[in-house]
Regions:
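Sec-dependent N-terminal signal peptides
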Residues: 1-13
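Acidic, serine/threonine-rich low-complexity disordered tracts
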Residues: 15-169
């Protein structure tokens, strides 16, 4: 599962939303707001750590435009990807393969801060692979993602994602 897919899973668990949840979280911010997330995948041979910084470039009633820079470490090797722009439509994606499995509220500590979060549990099947996840979202963080955990039939250990820094303008 890629970082983009993971973030999409985090934001698409409502049944069915009238507004794209990813758009809603970014629409509450001003241009220049950003979030840095760290994703860790443990494999049999090595840990893979990805750090992504997503910055809001523009927000309109129809869309939010973000740019993400990503650096991935495979053992002692590091790969930096070129910045990627993404338009997040205000309209939800009707083809989203997500099935909500539970919803609650919880207070957690992220980057040393206590945050009240909405917790979503979900299941999905994509390309014949079943996955489960749990995501903590909050309007305090640009983009909304505080923390997520994913498991899959083909992953030897859970994939974990957590916001480590952010600035909301």
């Amino acid at each position: 599962m890629t970082l983009a897919t993971a973030l999409l899973c985090v934001m698409a668990v409502q049944d069915p939303p009238k507004v794209n949840p990813r758009y809603e979280f970014w629409a509450e911010c001003k241009a220049g707001s950003w979030v840095k997330v760290k994703m860790l995948i443990k494999t049999g041979q090595m840990d893979i750590e990805t750090v992504a910084v997503t910055t809001l470039l523009e927000v309109t009633p129809e869309k939010a435009v973000v740019e993400t820079t990503t650096t991935t470490k495979f053992g002692d090797k590091e790969m930096k990807l070129p910045a990627k722009k993404e338009e997040i439509s205000q309209k939800p994606d009707p083809a989203q393969p997500m099935k909500p499995a539970g919803e609650s509220e919880e207070e957690i500590t992220v980057a040393g801060k206590q945050l009240k979060c909405r917790v979503y549990e979900f299941e999905m099947e994509q390309n014949g692979q079943k996955s489960k996840g749990k995501s903590w979202t909050t309007k305090t963080i640009p983009g909304g993602v505080a923390k997520s955990e994913f498991t899959s039939e083909k992953m030897p250990a859970p994939m974990k994602l957590e916001a480590v820094e952010w600035e909301k303008k």
